[in-house]
Amino acid sequence: MKMKQISDTTLKITMSLEDLMDRGMEIADFLVPQEKTEEFFYAILDELEMPDSFLDTGMLSFRVTPKPDKVDVFVTKSKIDQNLDFEDLSDLPDMEELAQMSPDEFIKTLEKSIADKTKDDIEAIQSLEQVEAKEEEQEQAEQEAESKKEPYIYYILSFAKLADLVVFAKTVTFEMETSELYKMNERYYLTILVDIENHPSPYPAWLLARMREFADDSDISRSVLQEYGQVLMSHDAVLNLQKIG
């Protein structure tokens, strides 16, 4: 569970499904407003370290956005306290003016003062909706980028001599799916297919740097090698080269 302050009036609390289960809640509990849900919200606020600006607030509103693997709770503080204090409504006339007002005039003045206060709340809700929309767009973009990420990489290395190729092959200790050996324009080209799906993001660059200690990185594509190069080993080239000498 984590909390993020979005603005002076809004907090975002993110809870995993496990967080909910640990507290005896499930997503279905948020679909219908009930006393249990409200008690849960305030219990969470007590559990987290609240910013000072929220400690002495009046009313709090809660907005729940369920996700497949988590729940986002947006907490917005109101500038109007549940127990309305006329002293907080600075736009109200003083007592002498109040005494000269008719009941209708007083009600209209009171409604205007409250409307001015609630304007901030409406703006806060609109701002919150914009924040939610941006966060959803960002999450969707990240998911799309992740789905487009290729789980495999073909490394293509170039060698001037076969002896250099054998030396490199004997240094290979990382896991690979397969490897091929081609010859084209009097040079040897080794393709190595590596599964990077379960490795950290820096791994491909680190692996390439390690390979380049013994070989030249090539800008020739595998399709070019397949079409114009001579195939010397169509699979497990590295394993076969390791057996030499």
UniProtKB/Swiss-Prot annotation:
Residues forming coiled coils: none
Stretches that traverse the bilayer: none
Free-text note on domains in this protein's UniProt record: The N-terminal domain probably binds unfolded/aggregated proteins; the C-terminal domain interacts with ClpC.
Protein name in UniProt: Adapter protein MecA
One protein family per Pfam: MecA
Subunit and interaction comment: Homodimer.
GO molecular function: protein-macromolecule adaptor activity
Family from the record: Belongs to the MecA family.
Family annotation (PANTHER family): ADAPTER PROTEIN MECA, ADAPTER PROTEIN MECA 1
Annotated source species: Streptococcus pneumoniae serotype 19F (strain G54)
Gene field: mecA
UniProt cross-references to InterPro entries, sorted A to Z: MecA_C_sf, Neg-reg_MecA
Entry function: Enables the recognition and targeting of unfolded and aggregated proteins to the ClpC protease or to other proteins involved in proteolysis.
